[in-house]
Amino acid sequence: TLRPRVEHAQILDPADLPRFAALGVIASMQPTHATSDMPWAQARVGADRLRGAYAWRQLTASGAALAFGSDFPVERVEPLPGLYAAVTRQDAQGEPEGGWLPKERLGLAEALAGFT
């Protein structure tokens, strides 16, 4: 059985978010990329496009399946930094306070499901 997915589904058009569940497409991302990208993302892609950036909560709410990974060797291979990023949307120093685009944070069980 084929399981179609979009790899690096990091910055999506919000209109496309519900299409993942409707079409049975897995949204594959690396949570640590969100915290690596956050310092420059708005300047490079614009505030409007950030509405669909690392949209884990929106994708989950629509019924889409998420697949998480580390993208090693681009990021560290250990899963704990990715779990931390998915739950807090903060970097290793705890920045920004409250998390980047915090409405997209996941619970620990949801983040763990993405990695397993």
What are these regions (language model features)?
Residues 1-4, 8, 14, 18, ...:
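His/Asp/Glu-enriched, well-ordered alpha-helical/loop segment
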